[in-house]
Amino acid sequence: MELPIAQFPDVQANRPKIPINLTRVGVTGVKKLVEIKRKDKRPIVLISTFEIFVDLPSDRKGANLSRNFEAMDEVLEKAINLPVYEIEKLCNDVAKSLLRRHEYATRSEVRMKSEYVVKREAPSTKMKCQEVVDIFAEATATRLEDGDIDVKKLIGAEVVGMTACPCAQEIMRDNAKTALRELGVGLETVMNFLNKVPMATHNQRGRGIISLEVSGDVDVSLETIIRIIESSMSSSIVELLKRADEALVVERAHQNPKFVEDCVRTMAQNIVSEFAHVPDSALVTIKQINEESIHRHNAFAERVALLGDLRDEIKNN
């Protein structure tokens, strides 16, 4: 004898007491194991944290949150079976799936954060080590009037490096010049010394952040973003350093002093040169945060612009 199937009431579909729209309803802190396959390379395995939202119309009491997990798991299983997959593509597909499952929603958002391990080597001894980079991706899907779904996707990274202050270095350079002249050292010898040996200055641990938001099937290389950020500061940093490596890192940083503003401008220039295939409509966000060593405050600089505007500025200046 078959038992009757129980029909449970859909409480979420009821009309709320206060009928107003909600911008975001969903779940946060969702941890998932994500396997990103790469062509001719070993897959990348990430433990990722997701935020998943849809908008909610005024005539619904709540959203069916279980559908968020259904959409996520469906796309993750699909990703495992594909030869190549990007994290922004993952968010893109989840955002689309959310709108298909939440028929009452007109907008969905998916945000993903992970720690990505990259291989590095010490500059002098060439010893191998691993560095951890924070990566993130987002996708926002909008249901159009004709029923199609438009998606904007974003990918970015945050990388830690080192900067040396140009201002304090010039002060120390001037002090060294005066002291050497008072000791009777000739001016030509003093200038040769100062040009060869970088002067002391205070340092910062810098955090560079780049994100690019694009539409359609435009690919943005995460590895390129990471490389641009690393090269924008006075020096990259390495977890494992022997004495020879440490001396070289410090020397490099002091030979390449940079303000927080310099880092952002360098990143902007390199984005323009490295991402020639990305359309002008891409939204670029560049940030640099330098944690000061001799102050309690941190230094900050940012540029937000369309890629086309950055191209015009750099070309015309």
Curated annotation (Swiss-Prot):
Annotated catalysed reactions: GTP + H2O = 7,8-dihydroneopterin 2',3'-cyclic phosphate + formate + diphosphate + H(+)
Cofactor: Fe(2+)
EC numbers, comma separated: 3.5.4.39
Gene Ontology MF term list: GTP cyclohydrolase I activity; GTP cyclohydrolase IV activity; iron ion binding
One Pfam family this sequence matches: GCHY-1
Residues annotated as site: May be catalytically important: 165
Pathway: Cofactor biosynthesis; 5,6,7,8-tetrahydromethanopterin biosynthesis
UniProt-listed InterPro entries: GTP_cyclohydrolase_FolE2/MptA, GTP_cyclohydrolase_MptA
Any one of the GO BP annotations: tetrahydromethanopterin biosynthetic process
Disulfide bridge map: none
Domain of life: Archaea
Cofactor detail note: Binds 1 Fe(2+) ion per subunit.
Xref: Gene3D superfamilies: Urate Oxidase (3.10.270.10)
Keywords: Hydrolase, Iron, Metal-binding
Biological function: Converts GTP to 7,8-dihydro-D-neopterin 2',3'-cyclic phosphate, the first intermediate in the biosynthesis of coenzyme methanopterin.
Protein family (similarity comment): Belongs to the GTP cyclohydrolase IV family.
Record text on subunit structure and interactions: Homodimer.
This protein's name: GTP cyclohydrolase MptA
Organism field: Methanococcoides burtonii (strain DSM 6242 / NBRC 107633 / OCM 468 / ACE-M)
Organism ancestry: Archaea, Methanobacteriati, Methanobacteriota, Stenosarchaea group, Methanomicrobia
Name of the gene: mptA
